[in-house]
UniProtKB/Swiss-Prot annotation:
InterPro entries: ATP_synth_asu-like_sf, ATP_synth_asu_C, ATP_synth_asu_C_sf, ATP_synth_F1_a_nt-bd_dom, ATP_synth_F1_asu, ATPase_a/bsu_AS, ATPase_F1/V1/A1_a/bsu_N, ATPase_F1/V1/A1_a/bsu_N_sf
Residue positions binding ATP: 174-181
SUPFAM superfamilies per the UniProt record, alphabetical: C-terminal domain of alpha and beta subunits of F1 ATP synthase, N-terminal domain of alpha and beta subunits of F1 ATP synthase, P-loop containing nucleoside triphosphate hydrolases
Species of provenance: Albidiferax ferrireducens (strain ATCC BAA-621 / DSM 15236 / T118) (Rhodoferax ferrireducens)
Gene: atpA1
Protein's recorded name: ATP synthase subunit alpha 1
UniProt similarity note: Belongs to the ATPase alpha/beta chains family.
Length: 517
């Protein structure tokens, strides 16, 4: 049999002309069951862990997305992000080939978004130029730089006793209604003018509470540099679980470009509960307190992303666009304890991951000592290196004074006659405790904080009644702002006190004390 070359070319031409190129065939599957926001899907063979899955659109035509979490032999377990009432057995599910992403960038500042980065504040769409994946590997050891710059919270008790540095993870832990959120909000308000972008992640809170926080930030002028990510109690467990990672990615955008960012997770106890719910519905085996086995990894992979990265990392990331700058992401995770039990599963996990903790106690809060910080067991493991010279030199003995005062106060209840040294220690402790009280939404600059600590150390307050100390402090601050503005500006700029500044502050405090009645 002979082949004619002309026939072969004709055959090839006809084949090419008759070819119909359709759309790319995407991996598709079928919904087997839908229960409590968990969907079992059959037929997805090429799906990735954490991949976004596309479900049928809802009644308004909005596409629904889910997250593939369980990859089993003959089915895939996925959680629906958002409403799932319109999804039924037999629906078609498509792979997107993308890991879950959220919008990032400066366009998000001043806005309130949900866990997927969609605006929920009624101010119109967000014109974000970029998106980024929510799950990322934390910077390695070589990419990091040690914490050496302060992150001022504006709270006397924290900045003097448990200082926080840029790139640190400092846990705020305490029972309900002890002022945990108030401490974090004050820290955000104090970042005004400090070139710090703040991200506030509200997990499992009442919508009214989130609204109050946003209102407080707006009144303080802090919303212009803050992004609020809200997954309220009315939203699905999947959204509450995802929200923290979304917020972290938004904060990392600034860290990786040589800027500083602060992120508050309020609170991680509720995130762990949401993750437990999702895991149990996916039929993963429960462990201690019914949490899944990877609940430690849930928080460690999140909090390890808060770091201070070195100049080379920033330069490599921006491909040379930003040179000679380090970036940082500081985390203030919040954990709620039950009746002060810090030995529960989630609190111990987060304490072991973070670089220190601020303990807030109900008894102190009820006694009117606010912020209700327990000085004895609150620590900052790396913040000491970041503390400003001014505060470091002036606050040396305060922590010891307070710890000894609490110990002695317990004994003094039983002793009728006390020796002179003990009495003096008790009086000093009472004065220091009174002076560390601070009203909410009124963080102090370091110059005024330094003036207060200076007055304590030099004994100017020893003969003033304890109940008049806060009015003395308020008056002193007003006097210094009025008559010694240059001195305050110098202290603020230098962040240290030389001999001349000390002499001027000494004279100013003495002069004010004479006029104080």
């Amino acid at each position: 049999m002979q082949l004619n070359p002309a026939e072969i070319s004709e055959l090839i031409k006809s084949r090419i002309e008759g070819l119909t190129a359709g759309a790319n065939i995407r991996n598709q599957g079928t919904v087997v069951s839908v229960t409590d926001g968990i969907v079992r899907i059959h037929g997805l063979s090429d799906v990735m862990q954490g991949e976004m899955l596309e479900f049928p659109a809802d009644a308004e035509g909005q596409p629904s997305y889910g997250l593939a979490l369980n990859l089993e032999r003959d089915s895939v377990g996925a959680v629906i992000l958002g409403a799932y009432e319109h999804i039924s057995e037999g629906n078609t599910v498509k792979c997107t080939g993308r890991i879950l992403e959220v919008p990032v960038g400066p366009e998000l500042k001043g806005r309130v978004v949900n866990a997927l980065g969609q605006p929920i504040d009624g101010k119109g769409p967000i014109d974000a130029k970029m998106t980024d994946v929510i799950e990322k590997v934390a910077p390695g050891v070589i990419a990091r730089q040690s914490v050496s710059q302060p992150m001022q919270t504006g709270l006397k008790s924290i900045d003097s006793m448990v200082p926080v540095g840029r790139g640190q993870r400092e846990l705020i832990i305490g029972d309900r209604q002890t002022g945990k959120t108030a401490v974090a909000i004050d820290a955000i308000i104090n970042q005004k003018g400090q070139n710090m972008t703040c991200v506030y992640v509200a997990i499992g809170q009442k919508a009214s509470s989130v609204k109050n926080v946003v209102r407080s930030l707006e009144q303080a002028g802090a919303m212009e540099y803050t992004i609020v990510v809200a997954a309220t109690a009315s939203e699905s467990a999947a959204m509450q679980y995802v929200a923290a990672y979304s917020g972290c990615t938004m904060g990392e955008y600034f860290r990786d470009r040589g800027e500083d960012a602060l992120i508050v997770y309020d609170d991680l106890s509720k995130q762990a509960v949401a993750y437990r719910q999702v895991s149990l519905l996916l039929r993963r085996p429960p462990g201690r307190e019914a949490y899944p086995g990877d609940v430690f990894y849930l928080h460690s992979r999140l909090l390890e992303r808060a770091a201070r990265v070195n100049e080379k990392y920033v330069e490599d990331f921006t491909k040379g666009a930003v040179k000679g700058k380090t970036g940082s992401l500081t985390a203030l995770p919040i954990i709620e304890t039950q009746a002060g039990d810090v030995s529960a599963f989630v609190p111990t996990n987060v304490i072991s991951i973070t670089d220190g903790q601020i303990f807030l106690e109900t008894s102190l809060f009820n006694a009117g000592i606010r912020p209700a910080i327990n000085a004895g067991i609150s620590v900052s493991r790396v913040g000491g290196a970041a503390q400003t010279k001014l505060i470091k030199n002036l606050s040396g003995g305060i922590r010891t004074d307070l710890a000894q005062y609490r110990e002695l106060a317990a004994f003094a209840q039983f002793a009728s006659d006390l020796d002179e040294a003990t009495r003096k220690q008790l009086e000093r402790g009472a004065r220091v405790t009174e002076l560390l009280k601070q009203a909410q939404y009124s963080p102090l600059p370091i110059s005024l904080m330094g003036a207060t600590l200076f007055a304590v150390n030099k004994g100017y307050l020893d003969d003033i009644a304890v109940n008049k100390l806060l009015s003395f402090e308020h008056g002193l601050h007003g006097y210094l702002k009025d008559k010694h503005a240059a001195l305050l500006a110098k202290l603020e700029a230098d962040k240290a006190m030389d001999k001349d500044a000390e002499a001027e502050l000494n004279a100013a405090t003495a002069a004010f004390k004479k006029s104080f009645a």
